[in-house]
């Protein structure tokens, strides 16, 4: 009984989730140098409260040996990979469509003396994916892409993982379907409907659906947790590639 309760609490407490070794001033200076989207500064400063990202990283940290290779499509500034680097991982790779975010990540890695290899690519239709990976991290992007499919994503990246390799991901749950105004962009809620953009949360799945999609694409769900009171409600999953 004690172990599940402890695991539940660790997934939700902010301790140990911050990126160490960089001040707000240093980060602001790097933001100016790289012309990275301002959202990345917020995400790095507030990383410890972004539980869906932190939990996925912590789970990979717990199950993978430190010599493992980890790839994050949609890595942005690489903050998640750099956190893993601060836990002792050395073979860290990422891709993103934002050149400014990638440059920020490279400069952060240099400042923190951490290994990081990143390149410009589309996570849904990648031109280059590493092979024989031990782990893949995918958080905070797939459900923002109109028309994205978790099944297609798993099918595409399964072959990049070793048999027995892990994939940690998050997903917005269908609870958000019941939130008033869920079809509209959250920043447009006070605008007239004709001026509102569609919701930024374009893909929403509950755990039974995740398990079904995972099974169909050669993965088993090892563990999951749902952040019930987050808005939007998100769940995190650790999948393992099976033969």
Give short role names for the model-derived ranges.
Residues 137:
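A conserved beta-strand element that flanks and buttresses the S-adenosyl-L-methionine
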Residues 151-163:
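A short glycine-rich, Lys/Arg-flanked "PGG" loop and its adjoining helix->strand segment in the class I
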Residues 146-147:
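Helix-capping/helix-break motifs at membrane-protein junctions
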Residues 68, 134:
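Conserved acidic residues
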Residues 1-64, 71-116, 120-128, 168-243:
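Class I (Rossmann-like) S-adenosyl-L-methionine-dependent methyltransferase catalytic domain
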Residues 140-141:
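Short catalytic micro-motifs in class I SAM-dependent methyltransferases
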